[in-house]
Amino acid sequence: MPVHEIRHPLVRHKLGIMRRVDLSTKSFRELSQEVAALLTYEASKDMALAPATVEGWCGTVEVEKIAGKKVTVVPILRAGIGMLDGVLSLIPGAKVSVVGLARNEETLQAHTYLERLVGELDQRLALIVDPMLATGGSMVATIDMLKRAGAREIRALTLVAAPEGIKAVLDAHPDVNIYTASIDQGLNEQGYIMPGLGDAGDRIFGTKQKVE
């Protein structure tokens, strides 16, 4: 199943707090990181391991380590930055690729203004992080970009997803797994997720949120 709605009690509890309109920027930012870490745990459960040895207190010990090249985390600017530290708290050695996409508020289409990808993507697991999967345009554009650069294993982590966005991603890229804390009702006329979290970028960075 390519869509994973993580219904762990901690995820449900933290997401419920994040839906509060009166939540402070500090709390929203911290909870974004915490939920991102929990999503990372789920998204990394089947990562390949390789045998290794280390020197322990009583001699050589056989252990296991993550096989292959380091993971790359791909935050979609700007809101994806709010989830980055949560992923890095579990995978501190991960490389970071940065993608800048802006959505045209009239057409709801995404256009790229920044692309900074790490090398050897064909040998890395790419974890895209973006709090909101709404229309799916930004996510599809990012996956397109990663695949053009050679990425073969891509997973998307998002706090809240709309069915419309999930469908758009899977129609374009059925091989990509989506991990989300919640599949919400759908999009309103402005393309925002309902009930959603509001504008995640504004809530993470403390900028003024537009209210329709």
Curated annotation (Swiss-Prot):
Pathway: Pyrimidine metabolism; UMP biosynthesis via salvage pathway; UMP from uracil: step 1/1. Uracil binds at I193, G198, D199, A200. It is an enzyme of class 2 (transferase). Its cofactor is Mg(2+). CDD domains: PRTases_typeI. Allosterically activated by GTP. Pfam families: UPRTase (PF14681). Its EC number is 2.4.2.9. SUPFAM superfamilies: PRTase-like (SSF53271). 5-phospho-alpha-D-ribose 1-diphosphate binds at R78, R103, D130, P131, M132, L133, A134, T135, G136, G137, S138, D199. The keyword Transferase applies. GO terms for biological process: UMP salvage; uracil salvage. One of its GO terms (molecular function) is GTP binding. Binds 1 Mg(2+) ion per subunit. The magnesium is bound as Mg-PRPP. The keyword Coiled coil does not apply. Catalyzes the conversion of uracil and 5-phospho-alpha-D-ribose 1-diphosphate (PRPP) to UMP and diphosphate. Belongs to the UPRTase family. This is Uracil phosphoribosyltransferase. It comes from Bordetella avium (strain 197N). The gene is upp.
